[in-house]
Design a protein with these regions (language model features):
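Positively charged n-region of N-terminal signal peptides that target proteins for export
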Residues: 1-4
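Bacterial N-terminal signal peptides
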Residues: 7-16
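Short S/T/G/P-rich N-terminal loop/turn motif that feeds into the first structured element of a domain
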Residues: 20-229, 234-274
């Protein structure tokens, strides 16, 4: 993962998201906001880093590009079991790129990459499977979901301080109503624990196609009039703000495990553009 190391080059690595081969406890996320006139250079440099990392058995991540939201924003997300795994994975990543380019060459490559960015930030999110709808039953199911995902719709909810318990209780009620109505799909929840505002929840819907959004049931149909009224009141009391973001999965900038690649090799190993 590209960890931008301040000073010489602090690169919060091309770590990242929404899952990479294991049901980890954390998501290690690097958010890159690219200069509009540098996007082509960003992609070119990133592909070099991805290839060097892949060739030398480096880290694993999935890359996502904002389709609807703040444009020219790319995130790299990796699964981590523990905080200690963050350090280990960073060392693996830096070692892989260093092996390909040498210490000086890797530093120069990272500096060029950094120069294409308007800003960047790292964020650590804890998986909240207890708040998720239709979480994967096992690692095989997890890999199947990630392999088929092409889009991710994320609802970012910022909860007022001291109201987390109320919000989480309401979210569990919504999940129960969705289960009762046999709602298709899944909603995977994570909560920011470092690098962002406390009380921030990410509710991600992983999709094979955008038309899945056309068939999503309304809150009223799931909760009923009384349940919807309760939801609206809890929402007004507990939520400070909500943001909706639609991401596109970018396979050419990703490096997912073989267990995922093997399920959709044509997608995860795209042929270079002529």
């Amino acid at each position: 993962m590209l960890r931008k190391v301040c000073g010489a080059l602090l690169f919060l690595a091309l770590t990242a998201a929404a899952g990479l081969g294991q049901q980890a406890g954390y998501l290690d996320v690097f958010v890159a906001r690219v200069k509009p006139d540098k996007r082509a250079e960003f992609d070119s440099l990133d592909k070099k880093i991805v290839e060097a990392n892949r060739r030398n058995n480096g880290d694993k991540w999935i890359a996502l590009e904002v389709a609807y939201g703040e444009q020219n924003t790319v995130i790299f997300s990796s699964s981590r079991e523990t905080f200690g795994d963050i350090e280990k994975s960073t060392a693996v990543f830096m070692g892989a790129v260093g092996k390909a380019y040498g210490a000086a060459g890797a530093a120069a490559l990272f500096q060029q990459f950094s120069n294409t960015l308007e800003s960047s930030r790292g964020e650590l999110r804890q998986r909240r499977w207890d708040l998720s709808y239709n979480p994967p039953a096992d690692l095989a199911a997890y890999a199947q979901v990630i392999a088929k995902s092409r889009w991710i719709r994320t609802v970012v909810v910022r909860v007022r301080p001291g109201h987390e318990a109320e919000f989480e209780a309401e979210l569990k009620e919504i999940n129960a109503a969705a289960q009762k109505s046999n709602m298709a799909g899944m909603r995977w929840v994570s909560q920011v624990v470092a690098g962002g505002s406390p009380g921030t929840y990410h509710i991600a819907r992983l999709m094979t196609s955008l038309d899945e959004l056309d068939h999503a049931p309304s809150m009223r149909s799931m909760l009923g009039d009384e349940g919807l009224e309760k939801f609206q009141k809890v929402n007004a009391d507990t939520v400070a703000g909500v943001e909706y973001i639609l991401y596109r999965v970018v396979p050419e900038l990703s490096n997912v495990p073989d267990a995922i690649t093997s399920l959709a090799p044509d997608f995860w190993n795209p042929k270079p553009q002529p």
